[in-house]
C-alpha cells in the first residue's frame, strides 16, 4: 500500500497544484467579498482544504472516465491509471473517499451550504463525461471550478445574492479561456480520438475566442468593482490581470503546444493578482477606517 502511495499522489495531481489554485482564487474572491474583507479563519481553512480535496477527487474521476482515451494522448499516456500502474476501482475509491472527507469538512456550516455542496458534487462528478456530448465542455468545467463562489456566500451570509451568480458567470468565461489554451495543446490527439473540446469547436477562431472570454471575465470584474465601490488597490490588481491576459495572447497566437501550455499555467498569476487587488482594497479600507 505504501509503495503505491506515490502513484496515488500522481493520480490526484498533488505534483501539479495549478488546478487547485485555479479553483482557489475565485473561491477566495467570494469569501473576501461576502465577508467584507474579514473571512473567519476556520471558514478559510474549510474552503481551502475542501478545494484541494475536491479538485483531487475530480482528477481521479477524470482519469477513470478518460482511461480509454488518455493512452492515445501524448501528454497523458503515462498517467498511473492509463499506464496500468493502478486499477480503475482504485481511482474510483480514492475519488469517493476524498469527496466524503470534503463533505465531512462542511458539516459545521449552515444548511444552505450543505445543499449547494450536493449540487457541486454532481457537477464535479459529471464533468469528465461532458467531453462526449457537449461541444464546449470547458463551460461546464467553469461551473464545477466556480461552485465554491455561491457556497462561500452561503457560508458567510446564509444566502446567495445575485453578485455570487455574476461572479460564477465570470468564472465560466475564465475557465473557457484557460482550458481552451489547455485544449490547444492536445488538439491533434483530440481530433484522432474523437472527443469534444472548445479548441476544436472554435476552430480557427480559437485565439479570438480565448481573448473574448478574457475580456468578458475582466469586463464583469469591472462591473463588480464599480458596483462595490472598490478603490485604487483593486483597480491595480485588475490592471495586472489585464496585462496577464494580453501576455497570454503573445503565447497562444501561433498555436504552438508548449507556449499554449505555458499560457494555461500562467493563469495562476491572473487569478492571484485579481484576488490580491480585492484583498488589498479591504485591507486598506480597514486601515483607513481605523
From Swiss-Prot:
GO terms for biological process: ubiquinone biosynthetic process. The keyword Magnesium applies. Its main location: membrane. Pathway: Cofactor biosynthesis; ubiquinone biosynthesis. GO terms for cellular component: plasma membrane. PROSITE patterns: UBIA. Its cofactor is Mg(2+). It catalyses: all-trans-octaprenyl diphosphate + 4-hydroxybenzoate = 4-hydroxy-3-(all-trans-octaprenyl)benzoate + diphosphate. Its EC number is 2.5.1.39. Keywords: Cell inner membrane, Cell membrane, Magnesium, Membrane, Transferase, Transmembrane, Transmembrane helix, Ubiquinone biosynthesis. The chain crosses the membrane at residues 41-61, 89-109, 133-153, 158-178, 202-224, 269-289. It is found in: Cell inner membrane. The keyword Membrane applies. It is a multi-pass membrane protein. GO terms for molecular function: 4-hydroxybenzoate polyprenyltransferase activity. PANTHER family: 4-HYDROXYBENZOATE POLYPRENYLTRANSFERASE, MITOCHONDRIAL (PTHR11048:SF28), PRENYLTRANSFERASES (PTHR11048). Catalyzes the prenylation of para-hydroxybenzoate (PHB) with an all-trans polyprenyl group. Mediates the second step in the final reaction sequence of ubiquinone-8 (UQ-8) biosynthesis, which is the condensation of the polyisoprenoid side chain with PHB, generating the first membrane-bound Q intermediate 3-octaprenyl-4-hydroxybenzoate. Belongs to the UbiA prenyltransferase family. This is 4-hydroxybenzoate octaprenyltransferase. The gene is ubiA.
Amino acid at each position: 500500500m505504501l509503495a503505491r502511495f506515490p502513484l496515488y499522489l500522481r493520480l490526484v495531481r498533488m505534483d501539479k497544484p495549478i488546478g487547485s489554485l485555479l479553483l482557489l482564487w475565485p473561491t477566495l474572491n467570494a469569501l473576501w467579498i461576502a465577508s467584507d474583507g474579514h473571512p473567519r479563519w476556520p471558514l478559510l481553512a474549510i474552503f481551502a482544504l475542501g478545494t484541494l480535496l475536491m479538485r483531487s477527487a475530480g482528477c481521479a474521476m477524470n482519469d477513470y472516465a478518460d482511461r480509454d482515451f488518455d493512452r492515445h494522448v501524448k501528454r497523458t499516456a503515462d498517467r498511473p491509471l492509463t499506464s496500468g500502474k493502478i486499477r480503475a476501482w482504485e481511482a474510483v475509491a480514492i475519488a469517493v473517499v476524498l469527496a466524503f472527507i470534503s463533505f465531512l469538512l462542511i458539516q459545521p456550516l449552515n444548511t444552505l451550504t450543505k445543499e449547494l455542496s450536493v449540487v457541486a458534487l454532481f457537477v464535479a462528478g459529471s464533468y469528465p463525461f461532458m467531453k462526449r456530448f457537449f461541444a464546449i465542455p470547458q463551460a461546464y468545467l467553469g461551473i464545477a471550478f466556480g461552485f465554491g463562489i455561491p457556497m462561500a456566500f452561503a457560508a458567510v451570509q446564509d444566502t446567495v445574492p445575485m453578485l455570487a451568480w455574476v461572479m460564477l458567470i465570470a468564472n465560466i468565461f475564465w475557465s473557457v479561456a484557460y482550458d481552451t489554451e489547455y485544449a490547444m495543446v492536445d488538439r491533434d490527439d483530440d481530433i484522432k480520438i474523437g472527443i469534444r473540446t472548445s479548441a476544436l469547436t472554435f476552430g480557427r477562431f480559437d485565439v479570438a475566442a480565448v481573448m473574448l472570454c478574457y475580456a468578458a471575465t475582466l469586463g464583469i470584474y469591472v462591473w463588480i468593482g464599480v458596483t462595490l465601490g472598490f478603490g485604487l488597490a483593486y483597480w491595480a490588481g485588475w490592471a495586472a490581470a489585464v496585462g496577464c491576459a494580453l501576455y497570454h495572447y503573445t503565447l497562444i497566437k501561433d498555436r504552438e503546444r508548449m507556449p499554449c501550455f505555458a499560457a494555461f499555467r500562467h493563469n495562476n498569476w491572473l487569478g492571484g493578482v485579481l484576488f490580491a487587488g480585492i484583498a488589498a482594497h479591504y485591507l486598506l479600507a480597514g486601515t483607513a477606517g481605523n
